[in-house]
Amino acid sequence: MATPSMMPQWSYMHISGQDASEYLSPGLVQFARATETYFSLNNKFRNPTVAPTHDVTTDRSQRLTLRFIPVDREDTAYSYKARFTLAVGDNRVLDMASTYFDIRGVLDRGPTFKPYSGTAYNALAPKGAPNPCEWDEAATALEINLEEEDDDNEDEVDEQAEQQKTHVFGQAPYSGINITKEGIQIGVEGQTPKYADKTFQPEPQIGESQWYETEINHAAGRVLKKTTPMKPCYGSYAKPTNENGGQGILVKQQNGKLESQVEMQFFSTTEATAGNGDNLTPKVVLYSEDVDIETPDTHISYMPTIKEGNSRELMGQQSMPNRPNYIAFRDNFIGLMYYNSTGNMGVLAGQASQLNAVVDLQDRNTELSYQLLLDSIGDRTRYFSMWNQAVDSYDPDVRIIENHGTEDELPNYCFPLGGVINTETLTKVKPKTGQENGWEKDATEFSDKNEIRVGNNFAMEINLNANLWRNFLYSNIALYLPDKLKYSPSNVKISDNPNTYDYMNKRVVAPGLVDCYINLGARWSLDYMDNVNPFNHHRNAGLRYRSMLLGNGRYVPFHIQVPQKFFAIKNLLLLPGSYTYEWNFRKDVNMVLQSSLGNDLRVDGASIKFDSICLYATFFPMAHNTASTLEAMLRNDTNDQSFNDYLSAANMLYPIPANATNVPISIPSRNWAAFRGWAFTRLKTKETPSLGSGYDPYYTYSGSIPYLDGTFYLNHTFKKVAITFDSSVSWPGNDRLLTPNEFEIKRSVDGEGYNVAQCNMTKDWFLVQMLANYNIGYQGFYIPESYKDRMYSFFRNFQPMSRQVVDDTKYKDYQQVGILHQHNNSGFVGYLAPTMREGQAYPANFPYPLIGKTAVDSITQKKFLCDRTLWRIPFSSNFMSMGALTDLGQNLLYANSAHALDMTFEVDPMDEPTLLYVLFEVFDVVRVHRPHRGVIETVYLRTPFSAGNATT
C-alpha cells in the first residue's frame, strides 16, 4: 500500500535545499549566485518542507492547524463526552495522526498535595524545639504529688491543686534603651522616647547582631499566650494580620476598629525580686499575644500523654515533615480517555453509513501498547511536555541499596560563633615591687574584667556523612516499607482508612529496620521492599516533572493537549466526507491523576472539572490533483489502509489469591497457526482498575498502574512456568538445558550449578529472555546492541545481587536478638522511633561481624530484580515445525488441527491478592475500507483469538 504513487510528489511539495530560487526573489537569487565564492548564504533562510506552490484554490488546506468545536457535549459526574463533526472537503485529506484534544479545566489536587520534602516553615529549628509559650500549672505540684497518700491532708491538697499559676518559656533577644510601663524603648524622636509598636514590635527576626553582646540590661521578645495551642517551632506558621507582619488575632475594639490584643508582661531577675524591695526594675518585657497557629506541612510524631490544653509536657512534643506527595496527570495522559471499556466509548463513523470504526475489546492494551511504541521509536528519558510524556522512573539507589558505608575518617566539628566560649573573667596583675614572689593588681591600663578561655577551644562533633546517609535511608526506604512494619505513634490522632494520606503520613517505622549498618558492604534490596511498588515514590522523576508542569499549588487551571492512541484511528487518512467523531474523558481522579504515595484521591478531596474540549487537526498540504489522485486510489479496496497494533496481543488476567503459589490456566482448543508467543508478569489487585466500568467504586488507589503504564515490578516472584499442549509431542523440544514443557525461572537450591550471574536466575531462562528480546541465543553471550536495548527490555532491567548473612545453624553462639533489644549507636539515636536521642553510649550488640579475623560463619543469599519488562517466551508461528528436535527433523504438530493449551505458573506467595497478567501475542490488525464518500468500514483481525467487525 505504501507505494510512491500515494506519497506527495516532490514536484508539488518540495524540500527547499541548496536551490532556494522557488521562494526567494530573483534579485536575491542572482546576488547569491554572484557572491557564492566569497559570501555563503548557506541556511540563512528557512529550510522547511513547504506547501504546494500551485493548484491550490483555498487557504483551508494551507493552514497549519484547524480547530473543531464540539457540536455536542455531555458532562456527567464521572465523565465528559465531546462530539465533533469532521467535514473533509473535496480534494483534501485529513491527517488523523496529527489530531489532538485541547482540554481546559480546573484541577484541585486536594489537601494531600505536597510537592516538596521537609517543611517551608522554620526548617532550621530542632524538631522538638517549642515556640515561646505559656501554660497553667499547679503552684505546688511537687508537694501535691508527695502528699497524695496522706489522707489527713486531703482537703489541703485539693485546695492547693486549684491554685493554677501561669508559667512562661520564652526568649527576649531584642536589646532596648529602657523599659517602662509603655514597654521597651527602641529610640528617641527629638526629646520624646519612642516605644515599640506592640502590634508587631519587637519583631522576632531582630536581636543582637554581634556574638559578643552578652550583657543585655533591657530586653524584649514576643510570647504566645496560654490560649494559643502549643506546637513545635519546626513547621509552625501563623498568618500576618497587619502590613508590618504582626500576627496577633484581630479583636474588635470599643471604637469599632480591629486590632490585635497584645499584652505586656514585665519580668525582673529572681534575685532582685527575692527581697521584695521598692527599687525593682524590670529586665525583660514579653509581648504576649494569641495567633492563628497552624502547621501546613508538618505533623506531630511524638506526643506526650497530657490532658486538654497547654502544659509543661507539651514542650517535649516532636514534629515531623509531612511526606511529599506529588500529584499530576499520568504519563501520556494515561487513564484520561476511555479505552478498553464496554459500550464503545469512542466513535468514528461516516455520517452516510453510521458504522462505528472503533471496535473495543476488553483486552485491547491500548495504553500499554502506546508506551512500548514510544520506547521503540524514541528515548523515553527525554521528556516531551506537550503530550505530558515523562516516563515513570525510580532512583536505582533506592530500589537496590549499595551500602558501601560512609567516608568519615576525619571528625567534623562545630564551634561557637566567636570561636571561644566558657571564658573566665580575670583581672590583670603584676609582680609586687621589691618582693620575689608577691603579686598585686594592675589597674593602671587594664580593665578589671577580662574574658579569657583556659584550655582548647570548646567544640561539638557530628558525623555529617553518617547522619546524611542514615537520613537518606529513613526518608527514601524506611518510610516506604509495608504498612505491617509500621506503627501509629501514641496520643496522635490518625485516620482509620489505610488508603488515606492522613494514615500513610502519620505512620512511623523504627529506624533500626533500615539503618546505616544494615547489609553494610552489600548491594542488596531489602526483602520487604521487593514487592512494594518502587514507582510510588517521591524520587519518581517523571511524576515529579509532570507535577511541576502544573505548578506548585493545590488549585490549577490547566490547559492540556491529549493525543489519540487507539491504533485503528491514530494513523488514519480521512478522505473527503462528513464524519462523526466522539470520545469520553474520565473525571475519576484516581484514574486520571497519579500521586507518589498512591493514596485514595477521591476520599482525600481531589477533583477535576473540564471547561472545554476542542479538537485540533491538520490537512495534508497537497495540491488538489495530488489529493484527488490519492483519494481515488484509497477508494479501491486493494489499497485499503491496514494498521497493526504495536503490542498485538490479547491480554488475560487470572486472579492469584493471597499466599497462593500455583496458578493453572487453560485455553480451549483452537488453531495456533498465527501465534507468536507469550508475555507475562504479575500485578497487584489493588493497583489494577476494572476497565470495563466507567467508574470503579472499589478502586481506592492513585499510584502507578502497571497494567496501563508498564511499571511492572513483580517479575522476580515467578519460579516456574509449565506449558503443555494436548498432543504427545514435547514442546518446545530438547534444545534447552532443562526439561521440555517446563521453564524454570529461578532456583533457590542450585546443586547442578544451573544459575547465572551470581544470582538465582537459571541460565535457561536468561537465554530465553535474550532470544525473545534481542535474538541472542545460539550465538553465545554478549551485550545486545544499544538500539535494541530499550527501556522496557530485559537486559537493561536485569539486576542480580548477592549478600552474606550469619549462618544461624553453623555458628554456635548465634542469638536471635529481636529489634526491641538490638542496640547500635545507643545514646545517640532515638529508641525505635524517629524521635529525640536517648540512652547511653555502649558497645553495639548488632549486627554480627562478617569480615575481619573474628568473622562469624555465614551463608550466601542470591536474588535478582527485573522491573519494567515483561517475561517473554517466543513461539514459532510455523506450528508445523515445533516440537522435539531429532536427527530426522522436528515432529509435526498438525497445524490444521486445533490444540488446547494448559499452563501452570509457580510463584512466590504474597500476602495480598494479585493477578497473573498474560499477553498472548497474536496478529492484531485493522483494515479500513472507504468505498464511498462518508462511509468508513473496519474489520479487526486477531488471529488466533478473536475478530471484530464494524460492517455488520
Curated annotation (Swiss-Prot):
N-acetylalanine: modified positions: A2
Keywords: Acetylation, Capsid protein, Cytoplasmic inwards viral transport, Host nucleus, Host-virus interaction, Late protein, Microtubular inwards viral transport, Phosphoprotein, T=25 icosahedral capsid protein, Virion, Virus entry into host cell
Keyword Metal-binding tagged: no
Site entry: Involved in interaction with pre-protein VI: G777
UniProt modified residues of type Phosphoserine: S175
Signals that turn on the gene: Expressed in the late phase of the viral replicative cycle.
Residue ranges with Acidic residues bias: 149-161
Matches recorded under InterPro entries: Adenovirus_Pll_hexon_C, Adenovirus_Pll_hexon_N, Adenovirus_Pll_hexon_sub2, ADV_hexon, VP_dsDNA_II
One Pfam family hit: Adeno_hexon
Region (Disordered): 149-172
Cellular component annotations (GO), alphabetically ordered: host cell; host cell nucleus; T=25 icosahedral viral capsid; viral capsid
Modified residues (Phosphotyrosine): Y940
A Gene Ontology molecular function term of the record: structural molecule activity
Membrane-crossing residue ranges in chain numbering: none
GO biological process, one term: microtubule-dependent intracellular transport of viral material towards nucleus
Chief subcellular location: virion
Localisation: Virion; Host nucleus
HAMAP family assigned: ADV_CAPSH
Assembly description: Homotrimer. Interacts with the capsid vertex protein; this interaction binds the peripentonal hexons to the neighboring penton base. Interacts with the hexon-linking protein; this interaction tethers the hexons surrounding the penton to those situated in the central plate of the facet. Interacts with the hexon-interlacing protein; this interaction lashes the hexons together. Interacts with host dyneins DYNC1LI1 and DYNC1I2; this interaction might be involved in intracellular microtubule-dependent transport of incoming viral capsid.
Role this protein plays: Major capsid protein that self-associates to form 240 hexon trimers, each in the shape of a hexagon, building most of the pseudo T=25 capsid. Assembled into trimeric units with the help of the chaperone shutoff protein. Transported by pre-protein VI to the nucleus where it associates with other structural proteins to form an empty capsid. Might be involved, through its interaction with host dyneins, in the intracellular microtubule-dependent transport of incoming viral capsid to the nucleus.
UniProt record similarity statement: Belongs to the adenoviridae hexon protein family.
More about this protein: All late proteins expressed from the major late promoter are produced by alternative splicing and alternative polyadenylation of the same gene giving rise to non-overlapping ORFs. A leader sequence is present in the N-terminus of all these mRNAs and is recognized by the viral shutoff protein to provide expression although conventional translation via ribosome scanning from the cap has been shut off in the host cell.
Protein name, as recorded: Hexon protein
Species per Swiss-Prot/TrEMBL record: Human adenovirus C serotype 5
Lineage, uppermost ranks: Viruses, Varidnaviria, Bamfordvirae, Preplasmiviricota, Tectiliviricetes
Gene name linked to the record: L3
